[in-house]
Amino acid sequence: MRLLLAEDNRELAHWLEKALVQNGFAVDCVFDGLAADHLLHSEMYALAVLDINMPGMDGLEVVQRLRKRGQTLPVLLLTARSAVADRVKGLNVGADDYLPKPFELEELDARLRALLRRSAGQVHEVQQLGELIFHDEGYFLLQGQPLALTPREQALLTVLMYRRTRPVSRQQLFEQVFSLNDEVSPESIELYIHRLRKKLQGSDVRITTLRGLGYVLERGDEVG
C-alpha cells in the first residue's frame, strides 16, 4: 500500500519512512505542508500520515483542503501530546485518527492497518482466500506456514488480497506499491507477479492475468 508521510523533522521522517517500508508500505516522504498538499492533489495514495506543525501549510489545513476536494483517503495526524485542541480540530476537519508523540512503531502500524481495513469496508483483522491467510499485523500464512516475502512482494500481495477475486490493473498496482523515488516502470510489476506465482505454487490460490484488465487473486478452482 502506498502512503504519503509528511513530517518536518527530517530525522524522524527518515526513521519512520524506513520502518514503514520494512512493514510493506511504499512511502513518499515530504517535509512541509505545501509539498504534501501538492502530492495529495496529483498522486494516488491509500492513506496519509501528516504532522500537524509543518512549515508552509500545517497538517490541519492540508486535511481541510483534501476533504474540500472530495478526497476520502484515510488520514492519521501526528500530534504533540499536549495539543488536545489541535487533535479535536483535526478530527473535526476530516482526519480519521491521531497519534500523540512520542509513540511506538507497533502502534503506528496497527493504527494504519485499522484505517485501511475501515476504508476497505472490512472489520476483521484476518483476511482469507483458500489456503492463503493475511493478518493485519503484516504477515501471510500459506497452508498454515509463514510465507516468506520481500517487503515489495508483500505490498503487492496485500493489494491483491484486499481486492481478491476482483481485477487490479498493472497501473493501479504500480501506483500503490512503488513510491515516487523508485526507479522502476509499470512493467516491473510482471517480475513481482512471477515471483509471487512461484511462491503460491502447490496451493489452491493463484494470480490470474486478465487481458486488458490486469491481475486477480483467486481460488485455483475458480474460473479466471
Swiss-Prot record:
InterPro entries, sorted: CheY-like_superfamily, OmpR/PhoB-type_DNA-bd, Sig_transdc_resp-reg_C-effctor, Sig_transdc_resp-reg_receiver, WalR-like, WH-like_DNA-bd_sf
Cellular component terms (Gene Ontology): cytosol; protein-DNA complex
Transferase among keywords: no
Domain Response regulatory: from-to ranges: 2-116
Modified residues (4-aspartylphosphate): D51
Alphabetized Pfam families for the sequence: Response_reg (PF00072), Trans_reg_C (PF00486)
UniProt entry keywords in alphabetical sequence: Activator, DNA-binding, Phosphoprotein, Transcription, Transcription regulation, Two-component regulatory system
Domain of life: Bacteria
GO biological process entries: regulation of DNA-templated transcription
GO molecular function: phosphorelay response regulator activity; transcription cis-regulatory region binding
Induction: TctD expression is regulated by catabolite repression.
The entry's DNA-binding region: 121-219
Keyword check for Transcription regulation: yes
Alphabetized PROSITE patterns for the sequence: OMPR_PHOB, RESPONSE_REGULATORY
Function: Transcriptional activator of the tctI tricarboxylate transport system operon.
UniProt cross-references to NCBIfam families, sorted A to Z: PRK15479.1
Protein name: Transcriptional regulatory protein TctD
